[in-house]
Amino acid sequence: MINWESNQTQLALKEIQSAVQMYGRGSRVVRLAYCYRRLRNLVYYGVQQQLQNCFCHPHLDSSKLHILLHLRGGLGDCASYRVCILALREKLPNAVFHYYTDSPHAAEVLFEADEKNVLLPSGKIPYRRAYDMACELCISFKTVYVNHARIQQLAPDFLPVLTLSLSRQKKLSFFLQDNYLLDDALGRFLYWQGAEKLEAQRYLSALDFDVAQTGSLPDSILKKDVSGYGLKKPYITLHSGIDATFNMKGSTPLKCWPKENWSTFVKLFREKFPHIQIVQLGGENSPKFDFVDVCLVGKSSLQDLPALLAGSTLHIDGESGLVQLTRWLPTRAVVLFANTAASLFALPKNINLTSDKCGACMWLEGPSWHTRCMLGYSSCQNMQTYTPEYVLEIVSRHLAA
């Protein structure tokens, strides 16, 4: 756990801020570019919110608190945010939570729509000031609007937590003022501190939760009928790909195991476990394997994934959204870590394979870190260390347990 108040931590954060601002010290053009970005964001989102106020202003029951939660990132990100959200739910048991996700339908995989949970459609961000509190969750936790009078009226016991949260957010205001840009820098800070990804959310939200928490999804999600896919138990699931909303531009993600390795692994696995069906899952950014028993790439809905994974004897994957989803499933995963750090993303319940042949380059150079090696290699050197024979040995050991 990070001691956020220590002088060492404060200096480390100041170092990042100084590095980000470095080129601006001697260049008026760079300083103007930063100002332009802040002004553009202010105007763009301000106009967008005003339009939402005019045309899509929600009518909410004034007898209850209404909390807007904007969950940024892909399915895996949203799955991890559920830890923070459950902690917030404990503090506000009677509030109505409204979920808006950047990744379409992600909330439907994680939350059951009822009188206390409203799943909003994708599209434009709802008008934030229509709610009593609006928060953005990514690596950070940012309160973008709060109606203090309403909180005082309907949830006075929450005020100390809110006050502490806002004071902490003020201390990290440099990162939060443009969190779309600087969340990556905050993520790198967590990495070098040896912390887990949710550590910043825990601090900024002032919610006391276990960053390694696991649990279960609602039965209506977990036990959904997926018999129509014709799967026969026992089966294992494979996945190779990243968030479907990411534009791959024909590239292969560095965090994905090469197709030839998958092919060899499946051949060896089938020889050793002929009675276990091999099922491939995936979305638009996943290649289709013709050597598996059942390929559901592009054929299964996002909403069916929890039930499909829950029925699996074992899931095998790179670090991905499906792996993060196992936090809330009975299924364990064998995870091949490549260019993302296990210290940040690994779940203790899973079998996490790591390599020190190279480092972890996540969040460097913007989105290109997904597909382009900064050191010029054609593929991730960490991922190259996992041979099909080695992975089969790990999988066999788990299946025999």
What is the meaning of each model-derived region?
Residues 2-401:
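Catalytic machinery of carbohydrate-active enzymes
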